[in-house]
Amino acid sequence: MNKDKQLHNDKINLSQLVLLGLGSLIGSGWLFGAWEASSIAGPVAIISWVLGFLVIGTIAYNYIEIGTMFPQSGGMSNYAQYTHGSLLGFIAAWANWVSLVTIIPIEAVSAVQYMSSWPWHWAKPMRYLMENGSISTYGLLAVYLIIVIFSLLNYWSVKLLTSFTSLISVFKLGVPMLTIIMLMLSGFDTSNYGHSASTFMPYGSAPIFAATTASGIIFSFNSFQTIINMGSEIKNPEKNIARGIAISLSISAVLYIILQSTFITSMPQSMLQHSGWNGINFNSPFADLAILLGINWLAILLYIEAFVSPFGTGVSFVAVTGRVLRAMEKNGHIPKFLEKMNEKYHIPRVAIIFNAIISMIMVTLFRDWGTLAAVISTATLVAYLTGPTTVIALRKMGPTMTRPFRAKILKVMAPLSFVLASLAIYWAMWPTTAEVILIIILGLPIYFFYEYRMNWRNTKKQIGGSLWIIVYLIVLSILSFIGSKEFKGLNMIHYPFDFIVIIVVALIFYYIGTTSSFESVYFRRATRINTKMRESLNNESKSSH
């Protein structure tokens, strides 16, 4: 009894969950996003942030229903296999894991990049961390060290993790808010938004969509899955998963939109007249802007924040990625030793060590922030394509399952989120779409090796449940290749008719995806998890009375 009480007390409450969510959401994205978005789209970039929030919010809506039905660690690596079998489960989990394991080095790279531009005299040796815009050999050692520290903070217990991220989250929220106040007081010029449609949208309407994916806006918002992947470690998950996602996503959206507005209105007119929005070249955008406006103390604080903010995100994602890898092992298509949990602290230590090694390999191969960001965005969006089809298939296959959060307008939201995820992949522009296919191809031989070891048991059925997404990704890549010049295609389909084609094709494949589900051993496992969750709810209800 005492042991159960201790385990319950060790679980994450709502306030800790919101701070953990914000710790993941507010990382290097806010430090780069506003500048990147305005350089692509100009003042209309503010609409790109609203659009990014709507895209991710719509996708998250599907996952809240599934996440509350199956509260488990690393949940997002399991959902697709429950309805469509192990191959689709593997594709979704592989894409999700690739995106998550790449967030660990991108945050370390971001911290090191800002360290290299610290203005203090004693920090001069830090300049050797960067070389021609990429991490140098010395910089790599610093990145490795930061990845090790991220991992060590996750190595002992959930309590240590939440204590650390709660402390950092308070700082991460405070500095952007202070930045907003000081920059608005020092330079607030609403005329920077322009006086007509042509000055508000200096580069046309297409960059509104391009900025949503290409400037790191989707990347900045997609961390809502941190909360879902912590599943079984959350107190009252049936209520707190939905609340945690809604609160942390909404707070971060408001913060990001105000930051973008502050960046636009604080920009000196002389600089805009000289180079235009797409000619502004900052190394550390908000710190450089603070120096331009003569607020040197704020610039120094921002240099410190630029180290702390990615640090908090990196720590959060080591926690999530370890649990995702452990969940993938239950699929039976990656080595069993990765599933091992530390009995005392209930932490997947082997998975954490393995992810740290992979993170180091990734950053050795891709040494700049932009390349790592491209890998994250495309892989994440592929994983998200399976959410809407899974939640609809579950409604058909398990109508009597307990749903603590039942999405009310799912028949609209599921196809809408599938279409939006498809468009967001297209907005990433050619050739990023083709790189998604490569990421999946790299994973498939691992899957088929384990199918071979299992004597190809039910392999034909698994392919039948998953072929639609493989074909769809190839079709999306072809559409990106022949699409409009605004999205780096051959311009065989002109803008905005390319969007109409994507929407129609997406709805066709969405329908095929929802009708490709079948009952398997994984669905029976899902039924057991849901039954256990219902019993837990009933027991809690009885004890409260």
Where are these regions (language model features)?
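Terminal cytosolic tails of multi-pass membrane transporters
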Residues: M1-K11, V391-M413, A434-H545
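Membrane-interface "cap" regions at the ends of multi-pass membrane proteins
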Residues: M1-W35, I40-V44, I56-Y61, Q72-S73, ...
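Helix-loop-helix junctions that connect adjacent transmembrane segments
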Residues: K3-N9, I46, L51, W122-T137, ...
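Loop-to-transmembrane helix boundary motifs in multi-pass membrane proteins
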Residues: N9, L14, T137-Y144, K235-E238, ...
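Extracellular loop-to-transmembrane helix junctions
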Residues: N9-I12, F32-Y138, I251, I258, ...
